[in-house]
Amino acid sequence: MKRPGKRWLWLIPCVLALAVGLFLLLRSCAASLSAPAPSAALLQAADGLDEIVLQAAFLPESRSLRVTQRMALTSRVDDARDTLVLRTWPNAYQSMETSPLTLTELYDAAYPEGFSTGALVMEEATVAHGDGAAEKVFYRYTDTAKTVLSLPLAQSWGCGETLTVTLRYTLMLPKAASRYGVMNGVYAVGNAFPLPALYENGAYRTDDYSPIGDPFVSECANFSLELTLPDGYQCAATSFPSETRQDGEKQVMTFSAPAVRDFALVLSQQFQAVQAMEGNVLVSVYAPDGNWARQALAFARAALRCYNELYGDYPYPSLTLTGSTLPYDGAEYPGLCLLSSSLTGDELEKAAAHEVAHQWWYAIVGSDSVNNAWQDEALSQFSALSYWERAHGAAARAEWYEQEIAPSLRITLNATAGAPLSWFSSLGEYKSLVYDRGTALLCAADELLGGRMNDFLRLYRERCAFGMASRQDFLSLLTEYSGEDFTPLFEDYLDTLITP
């Protein structure tokens, strides 16, 4: 056998270069930067909030997560209550009759393989009053969809008193392109963990899981999660993991998210991750397509930079976006934006701008997305318009307005922009009224304010951060800011049917 001559030596550096390149490529597919620590302002906002501690094991082979959830909930209302009500949204996915994805406009895209069942299978619930011992609770569901979980209390729950609630359950994900489901190797876990139902006017809110809009209303709390998942999976979440350690063939990730309204996550083996710091915020994008992820990262950073300047600094240490299979453009969670991976070019940039704006108008400033959906959707769309003007010029903004927003003022529909979600008969109707006509209202108010609407929105953010703002709160603050009564204008755009 002949020995290779020197002419083969040139291959050695090539092979080494190839190996280094492959190593760097594989390294680029995983997140490598870390998020900064929470700011003093965020920790101040988190002080005294309810605590929600989650331990979850992700089991991809069964499309499930096994969860233990512990909540320390303090009553802040005068009423003494004898029940605690939690919202268990995943149960709506159990049947065709209750799934939010069976709307005609969504079904084929959401269930390409046919209907698939999802659920939250409750195993045990215990409640402790104050420092007392935990007692098992015989819970019951009070609605057909099993999204309203009622826990009877052994003694009344008074103002200032704390309950410690412990739940054990399994989340079962449907095969569905959705905010809650599995499709193309991407596992979306949104609106999954049980949260206290909003309590107002002497009663718990028990809104239906509407297939239109975002029927989820919750107050800020401090979340933490310890997630066990198989090697090879990456996790995009409401916060960036503060620690990742190895446990045999599994990873254990630890997350902490102070002062947020919910905690969501998206997992996949196929994700490529790209990251960059934008000021003091770690911006990450996870998507199967690396080029798509890099585009989305650029758009997210630009939008974040714009809104920081317009509305005040984003308060959380991280902002994460994912490329997911969705039957709509996107979905928002605190610190996490889900975007349809089918979006490209201008449509991707507009969707990213809109979803990032939701970090101000939903995540930071909460509102009633069931009865006043315009208050986060129209504000986010108006913010995206402002971003579009900064990024592409006044003519580009005017073109967007004329093509997508102005037509909503000329069409006749059987609902109004200020209507509750149950009034809308289709996604198209909802978009035309809530997004477009709602944005037209804000543009009209901006004109009356001499172009100062974004200055007002900055004040709105300052006054209402981490709370829940009503329509009247918005109007009252606008009157205080401007010295004018905008009620007639709002009633015209939000409450008046356009007739032929």
Spans of features found by a protein language model:
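N-terminal, polar/Ser/Thr-rich
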Residues: 7-66
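Short beta-strand elements of extracellular/lumenal beta-sandwich folds
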Residues: 63-76
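Extended, low-hydrophobicity, Ser/Thr/Pro/Gly-biased non-transmembrane segments
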Residues: 70, 108-123, 140-141, 147, ...
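Solvent-exposed beta-hairpin/edge-strand motifs
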Residues: 81-132, 228, 232
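Short Pro-Gly-centered flexible turn/kink motifs
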Residues: 158-167
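Hydrophobic helix-coil surface modules that form long, contiguous segments used
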Residues: 214-353
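Zinc-dependent metallopeptidase catalytic helix centered on the HExxH motif
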Residues: 294, 338-403
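Amphipathic alpha-helical substructures
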Residues: 395, 431-500
